[in-house]
From Swiss-Prot:
HAMAP family: NDH1_NuoH (MF_01350). One of its GO terms (molecular function) is NADH dehydrogenase (ubiquinone) activity. Core subunit of the mitochondrial membrane respiratory chain NADH dehydrogenase (Complex I) which catalyzes electron transfer from NADH through the respiratory chain, using ubiquinone as an electron acceptor. Essential for the catalytic activity and assembly of complex I. The gene is MT-ND1. It comes from the Eukaryota. This is NADH-ubiquinone oxidoreductase chain 1. Pfam families: NADHdh. Keywords: Alzheimer disease, Amyloidosis, Diabetes mellitus, Disease variant, Electron transport, Epilepsy, Leber hereditary optic neuropathy, MELAS syndrome, Membrane, Mitochondrion, Mitochondrion inner membrane, NAD, Neurodegeneration, Primary mitochondrial disease, Respiratory chain, Translocase, Transmembrane, Transmembrane helix, Transport, Ubiquinone. GO terms for cellular component: dendrite; mitochondrial inner membrane; mitochondrial membrane; mitochondrion; neuronal cell body; respiratory chain complex I. It comes from Homo sapiens.
Length: 318
C-alpha cells in the first residue's frame, strides 16, 4: 500500500511538470505574438511526451575528460530531491506526516546544491564550473532569507508541522499579517529555483547554458524535470504557508480544488515574470539579498518575537 501511495503522489507530479513546460512555451509564444507548440497532437498537447521520447531515446554523451560517476549521479540526485520534497506537504493529507516537516523541506532543499555543484565540476568545462559556482552561491544565499521567513511564520503557527499551518489559517491567511515576508519569500523562491530574473546560472549570453552545458539526452531531461518540479513544489509550499485553505471533512474535494487553483495562479505568475523581466546582474542579485532582504527579514523576525511578549506583559484593562 505505501508503494501505491508513493506512485499516486509521484505520477501526477510528473504529469503536471510535463504540462507546465508546455504551458510555459505557450505563454512565451503568445506574449511574443506567435503560436508556440501546436503541431504534435491537438493544440500541441502531446508536445511534452514527444520531447520526452526524443530525449530519452537519444544516446547520452559522456565527455572524455569528465568524472563519469558524479556526471551521471548529479541529474539523478536533482530529480530525486525534487520529488522527495513533496512527501510532507499536506494536500490535505501528507504522504508522511512529519512533526518537523518544514525543517525537513529546508534541509532537503539545501541538498539540491550538491547536484548543481557536482554537475558543474564533473563536466570539466569552464562554462559549467562558473555556472555551478554562481548557482551554488545564489542558492545558499537565498536559503538564509527563506529560513528566517519560515521562522517568522512558525512563531505565528507555533509548530514545524505543515498540517498545523492549515489549522492556523482557518480564519485568516498568514499573507495578511505578514505581507512583507510573503513578498520577500516569493522573490526568494524565484532565486532558489534559478528562474528569471535570477537565472544567472544559465546565462545563455555569457555562459552558453551554464552548469548543464555538457549534458544531452536523458541526463539533460532529468535536470529540466527537477527544475520544473521544484517550481510547482515551491508554489505549493507558498500556498500552504501564506494562503492556507480550510479543510472541511464533509467536502474534502473543495480543499483540493482551492489548493490547486492557488498553486496554479502562483505558477502562472512565475511564467509571467519569465516573459516580462530581464536578467539581473550578479552583483545586483547579491546586493538585493545581503543589503536589503537580510536586514528586513531579521527586523521583522524580531518584531514577531517581541509582539507576543509585549502584549502578554501589558496588564489587563479593568
Amino acid at each position: 500500500m505505501p508503494m501505491a501511495n508513493l506512485l499516486l503522489l509521484i505520477v501526477p507530479i510528473l504529469i503536471a511538470m510535463a504540462f507546465l513546460m508546455l504551458t510555459e512555451r505557450k505563454i512565451l509564444g503568445y506574449m511574443q505574438l506567435r503560436k508556440g507548440p501546436n503541431v504534435v497532437g491537438p493544440y500541441g498537447l502531446l508536445q511534452p511526451f514527444a520531447d520526452a521520447m526524443k530525449l530519452f531515446t537519444k544516446e547520452p554523451l559522456k565527455p572524455a575528460t569528465s568524472t563519469i560517476t558524479l556526471y551521471i549521479t548529479a541529474p539523478t540526485l536533482a530529480l530525486t530531491i525534487a520529488l522527495l520534497l513533496w512527501t510532507p506537504l499536506p494536500m490535505p493529507n501528507p504522504l508522511v506526516n512529519l512533526n518537523l516537516g518544514l525543517l525537513f523541506i529546508l534541509a532537503t532543499s539545501s541538498l539540491a546544491v550538491y547536484s548543481i555543484l557536482w554537475s558543474g565540476w564533473a563536466s570539466n568545462s569552464n562554462y559549467a564550473l562558473i555556472g555551478a559556482l554562481r548557482a551554488v552561491a545564489q542558492t545558499i544565499s537565498y536559503e538564509v532569507t527563506l529560513a528566517i521567513i519560515l521562522l517568522s511564520t512558525l512563531l505565528m503557527s507555533g509548530s514545524f508541522n505543515l498540517s498545523t499551518l492549515i489549522t492556523t489559517q482557518e480564519h485568516l491567511w498568514l499573507l495578511l499579517p505578514s505581507w512583507p515576508l510573503a513578498m520577500m519569500w516569493f522573490i526568494s523562491t524565484l532565486a532558489e529555483t534559478n528562474r528569471t530574473p535570477f537565472d544567472l546560472a544559465e546565462g545563455e549570453s555569457e555562459l552558453v547554458s551554464g552548469f548543464n552545458i555538457e549534458y544531452a539526452a536523458g541526463p539533460f531531461a532529468l535536470f529540466f524535470m527537477a527544475e520544473y518540479t521544484n517550481i510547482i513544489m515551491m508554489n505549493t509550499l507558498t500556498t500552504t504557508i501564506f494562503l492556507g485553505t480550510t479543510y472541511d471533512a464533509l467536502s474534502p474535494e473543495l480543499y483540493t480544488t482551492y489548493f490547486v487553483t492557488k498553486t496554479l495562479l502562483l505558477t502562472s505568475l512565475f511564467l509571467w515574470i519569465r516573459t516580462a523581466y530581464p536578467r539581473f546582474r550578479y552583483d545586483q542579485l547579491m546586493h538585493l539579498l545581503w543589503k536589503n532582504f537580510l536586514p528586513l527579514t531579521l527586523a521583522l523576525l524580531m518584531w514577531y518575537v517581541s509582539m507576543p511578549i509585549t502584549i502578554s506583559s501589558i496588564p489587563p484593562q479593568t
